[in-house]
C-alpha cells in the first residue's frame, strides 16, 4: 500500500486561526475552528498517516540562538490564553485521529524536516501543511508543501517566482539576504535582487566567495561579512537528523466514525 504522510505544522496553523478571533480568550472557538480546518485537510489530502508537530514552549530558543544570539529574539510570546489551551486543543485533535509530536527542545521545523525527508527519501508521498516557506528547501518529487490559508502549493515554480533561485539554494539565499522576521542579518547591502544574481551565477555562498570572477560590487561585502553569511545560512538550513523516537506505524491514520 502506498503511503501518504501529512505533517501539520501545528502552531503555524493554530496561531493563524487564533489571531483573527474577536475574543482571544475563547479557546473553545479556537478548537472548533482548527478542528473544522483539519477535517477539510483530511478530506482533501486523504492521508494514510498524519501527525501534528508542536514547538517546545521553553524560554530556550534552541541551537540556532546559540550560534546566532539575536535569532528570534524579538518574536512575540504566545498569548497566555492560547498557551493554557494547548492541551485541550491537542486532545480535540487526538479525538479526530491526529496524534501530536511535542518537542522537548528542538524546533518544530527541524522535527518536521527530519520526519518528512526520512519518509520522502523512501519514495513515499509527504505533504507538509504550513505557510512557512522555510520548508521549501526540502522540496522533492515526493515532498510537497501546502499553504492551506492561501490555497496554494509552495512548489518549485512558486519558489522560482518568489525568490528566483532553486529550492536547494534557499538556505544560501537567506544566508545572503537575511530573514528580518527572525533577526537573521545576512550580508549588509545584499538584497533579494543581488542574491538572485549571485545564486544564478554560482551554486552557493562558498563557491561565490572563492570565485575569482565575483563582481567587485560584491567582493568587499563578501570579504567583510562571509562569516555572518555562513552563520545565517546555517540557521536557515533545516536539520534532518533528529532522533524522533517513533516509527510510521505509530502515526497511521484511522478515520474516526
Swiss-Prot record:
One annotated GO biological process: DNA replication, Okazaki fragment processing
Binding sites annotated in the UniProt record for K(+): 176, 185, 187, 190
Keyword hit for Lyase: no
Cofactors, names only: Mg(2+); K(+)
Domain named 5'-3' exonuclease: residues: 165-254
Entry annotated with the keyword Cell wall biogenesis/degradation: no
Record text on cofactor binding: Binds 2 Mg(2+) per subunit. Only one magnesium ion has a direct interaction with the protein, the other interactions are indirect.
This protein's UniProt keywords: DNA-binding, Endonuclease, Hydrolase, Magnesium, Metal-binding, Nuclease, Potassium
InterPro entries: 5-3_exonucl_a-hlix_arch_N, 5-3_exonuclease, 5-3_exonuclease_C_sf, DNA_polI_H3TH, FEN, HhH2, PIN-like_dom_sf, Xni
List of residues binding Mg(2+): 109
Signal peptide: none
Gene3D superfamilies: 5' to 3' exonuclease, C-terminal subdomain, 5'-nuclease
This enzyme's EC code(s): 3.1.-.-
MF-aspect GO terms: 5'-3' exonuclease activity; 5'-flap endonuclease activity; DNA binding; magnesium ion binding; potassium ion binding
Task of the protein: Has flap endonuclease activity. During DNA replication, flap endonucleases cleave the 5'-overhanging flap structure that is generated by displacement synthesis when DNA polymerase encounters the 5'-end of a downstream Okazaki fragment.
Name of the molecule in the record: Flap endonuclease Xni
Originating gene: xni
Amino acid at each position: 500500500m502506498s503511503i501518504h504522510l501529512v505533517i501539520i505544522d501545528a502552531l503555524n496553523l493554530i496561531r493563524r486561526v487564533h489571531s483573527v478571533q474577536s475574543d482571544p480568550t475563547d479557546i473553545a472557538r479556537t478548537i472548533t475552528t482548527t478542528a473544522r480546518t483539519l477535517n477539510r485537510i483530511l478530506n482533501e489530502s486523504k492521508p494514510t498517516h498524519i501527525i501534528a508537530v508542536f514547538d517546545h514552549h521553553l524560554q530556550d530558543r534552541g541551537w540556532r540562538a546559540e550560534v546566532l544570539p539575536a535569532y528570534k529574539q524579538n518574536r512575540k510570546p504566545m498569548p497566555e490564553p492560547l498557551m493554557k489551551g494547548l492541551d485541550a486543543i491537542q486532545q480535540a485533535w487526538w479525538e479526530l485521529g491526529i496524534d501530536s509530536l511535542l518537542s522537548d527542545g528542538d524546533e518544530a521545523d527541524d522535527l518536521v524536516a527530519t520526519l518528512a525527508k526520512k519518509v520522502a527519501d523512501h519514495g513515499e508521498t509527504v505533504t507538509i501543511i504550513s505557510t512557512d516557506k522555510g520548508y521549501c528547501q526540502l522540496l522533492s518529487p515526493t515532498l510537497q508543501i501546502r499553504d492551506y490559508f492561501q490555497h496554494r502549493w509552495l512548489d518549485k515554480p512558486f519558489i522560482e517566482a518568489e525568490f528566483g533561485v532553486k529550492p536547494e539554494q534557499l538556505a544560501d539565499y537567506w544566508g545572503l539576504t537575511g530573514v528580518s522576521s527572525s533577526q537573521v542579518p545576512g550580508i549588509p547591502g545584499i538584497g533579494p535582487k543581488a542574491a538572485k544574481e549571485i545564486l544564478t551565477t554560482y551554486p552557493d555562498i562558498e563557491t561565490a566567495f572563492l570565485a575569482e570572477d565575483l563582481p567587485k560590487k560584491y567582493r568587499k561585502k563578501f570579504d567583510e561579512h562571509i562569516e555572518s553569511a555562513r552563520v545565517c545560512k546555517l540557521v536557515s538550513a533545516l536539520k534532518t537528523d533528529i532522533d524522533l523516537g517513533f516509527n510510521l506505524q505509530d502515526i497511521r491514520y484511522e478515520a474516526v466514525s
